[in-house]
Amino acid sequence: MPRRNLLKGFKRPKVLEFLSENSSECYGKFTASPFETGFGTTVGNCLRRVLLSSIQGYAVTGVRITSFDADGVAHFISSEFEQIPHVREDTLEILNNFKRLRFLLPQGAESSTFTYEFRGAVSLTGKDFAKKFQLEVLSQDLLIMEMMDGAHVEVELHVEFGRGYVPAESHDRYADLVGVIPVDAIFSPVLRVRYDIQSCRVGQRGDYDQLSLEVWTDGTVRPEDAIAEAAKIIKEHFTVFVNFDETALDLEDEPEEDDPAVLELLNTKIADVDFSVRARNCLLTMGIKTLGELTRISEQTLANTRNVGKKSLSEIQGKLQEYNLRLGMADYNHVGVVSRLMRQKEEIDEA
């Protein structure tokens, strides 16, 4: 039986803040705070390892290269050590280039095979292997091979959806396919992850952790989606260690919110606050229904939201100040203090 107050006093982040500066489809920087001392490093290291090893993506798992002579007679390239006639690069180098290609298949596709035919003197790059509505190639400028006069080759690519790194010898299903050369598959779309821990202040304490996380991907998955997938993987692996009914646990987000007046304030509906029609509609469109939910949104996140201009942002901040609240709150102690002082003043006035 767990202690009902198991998480009492634990500071935990309420919002993952996306820093939009220099962000792109391939790069994102995020911050989360506050963490108890040491928890920022624990979470950051765990996320980094899972991001680099366990996010799913597409990769080439097998290649069949057929060379044709002047009479049109076909010959399968039997291994990575056999040279392709009238092609400048070694076959091993060409296979390594195919391994570096980054793909996207139509949503839901687990695997597919694509066939191409090339003739004459031409430099083949990633864009030459794209198939409209079937295969999107993101590394379009990657040089695959240079063909010379007299070259005539057919290339068959086997593209699959997978996780992590899978060596060529694991693709034993190609053993019965004549001419298919299995290759090492690098499925991970996450290229690099860096995290940093800084101190942050909550109330009178300045020893909490703030986690900054930078993620670089190949463009087949957005950085924020990769983080979400990594967090889900970690969460599912820890579930087996919980040997009690979590509904019996008193999951207090912030103990200082137990003050009835604070809870009442944070549960105030956005529709009941004197916002302008535009500001209210923007918040409701974002799915923000109460003042408590609004205080957990960072200023940067709100400013980057569509249809929230400077005027609306200023209005929202001003209205929160009237309630002794602000954007990006993690500590409600002062709200409780102000609430108690106001109640004491009302009691004195009534007396």
From Swiss-Prot:
Residues covered by region (Alpha C-terminal domain (alpha-CTD)): 261-351
EC number: 2.7.7.6
Annotated keywords: DNA-directed RNA polymerase, Nucleotidyltransferase, Transcription, Transferase
One MF term in the entry's GO annotations: DNA binding
Signal peptide: none
Matches recorded under InterPro entries: DNA-dir_RNA_pol_insert, DNA-dir_RNA_pol_RpoA/D/Rpb3, DNA-dir_RpoA, RBP11-like, RNAP_asu_C, RNApol_insert_sf
Ranges for region Alpha N-terminal domain (alpha-NTD): 1-245
Record flagged with keyword rRNA-binding: no
Catalytic activity field: RNA(n) + a ribonucleoside 5'-triphosphate = RNA(n+1) + diphosphate
Task of the protein: DNA-dependent RNA polymerase catalyzes the transcription of DNA into RNA using the four ribonucleoside triphosphates as substrates.
Stated family: Belongs to the RNA polymerase alpha chain family.
HAMAP family: RNApol_bact_RpoA (MF_00059)
Subunit note: Homodimer. The RNAP catalytic core consists of 2 alpha, 1 beta, 1 beta' and 1 omega subunit. When a sigma factor is associated with the core the holoenzyme is formed, which can initiate transcription.
Protein name, entry field: DNA-directed RNA polymerase subunit alpha
Organism this protein belongs to: Treponema pallidum (strain Nichols)
